Amino acid sequence: MGVEKIKAAFENGKKAFIPYVMGGDGGLEKLKERIRFLDEAGASIVEIGIPFSDPVADGPTIQRAGKRALDSGVTVKGIFQALIEVRKEVQIPFVLMTYLNPVLAFGKERFVEKCLEAGVDGIIVPDLPYEEQNIIAPLLREANIALIPLVTVTSPIERIEKITSESEGFVYAVTVAGVTGVRQNFKEEIHSYLEKVKLHVNLPVVAGFGISTKEHVEEMVTICDGVVVGSKIIELLENEKREEICELIYATKQKEEA
């Protein structure tokens, strides 16, 4: 469980496909059902969003999903309960994407305890600066839960090395400046940025933000170790276009054999 389980998703040249689902969008039964579907479809890790009223890193699609979840009365406690229940049925690693505020409001010790109970293997906190990681990092380390770092196009290499030196799991490389969301294409400099990150860190590098097509997936996994797809997954789940999700997963796995 925990850090080792995330490591296993990248072993032997495996390319990781990491779909993002908003916890409680459509209800908690829907969350469990979607996790079961993504596990069966061959996703490597599932990223579960904790809805928050001020989601600074989220684009419009994810913001709307979070608002739907909050409007329906979904709570952090409820999401943990759903994860505890579905964990009995699936082995796929769970990574939580949460802003710092919900963690502190819930109580950080209690939050980490619930992560353990629900079989959460890693967490991403996009608004937690590296300099303030000690707010939660020691508790997570003790629980063998990875605190996954985000690096951006504008991060100098020295900072990337510093941020990732004590990290575990994988490095989340943000591929665009700005918020999440669907994009048409990626600029050339993104390629050199990802190659630079790969060169300077000792963890798998996963690209995320704006990845929405098979072409994007193929492009990104030739350079790095996996992709996170968020806004597009929410859109496809909402419109019941699940075969397109399977195609994105297939596009990732094809690159393992290349």
UniProtKB/Swiss-Prot annotation:
InterPro entries found in the cross-reference section: Aldolase_TIM, RibuloseP-bd_barrel, Trp_synthase_alpha_AS, Trp_synthase_suA
Pathway: Amino-acid biosynthesis; L-tryptophan biosynthesis; L-tryptophan from chorismate: step 5/5
E.C. no: 4.2.1.20
UniProt xrefs under Pfam families: Trp_syntA
Swiss-Prot/TrEMBL catalytic activity: (1S,2R)-1-C-(indol-3-yl)glycerol 3-phosphate + L-serine = D-glyceraldehyde 3-phosphate + L-tryptophan + H2O
An example molecular function term from Gene Ontology annotations: tryptophan synthase activity
GO-annotated cellular components: cytosol
Catalytic residues identified in the record: E47 (proton acceptor), D58 (proton acceptor)
CDD domains, A to Z: Tryptophan_synthase_alpha (cd04724)
Keywords of this entry: Amino-acid biosynthesis, Aromatic amino acid biosynthesis, Lyase, Tryptophan biosynthesis
Subunit structure: Tetramer of two alpha and two beta chains.
Primary role: The alpha subunit is responsible for the aldol cleavage of indoleglycerol phosphate to indole and glyceraldehyde 3-phosphate.
Family: Belongs to the TrpA family.
The protein's name in its UniProt record: Tryptophan synthase alpha chain
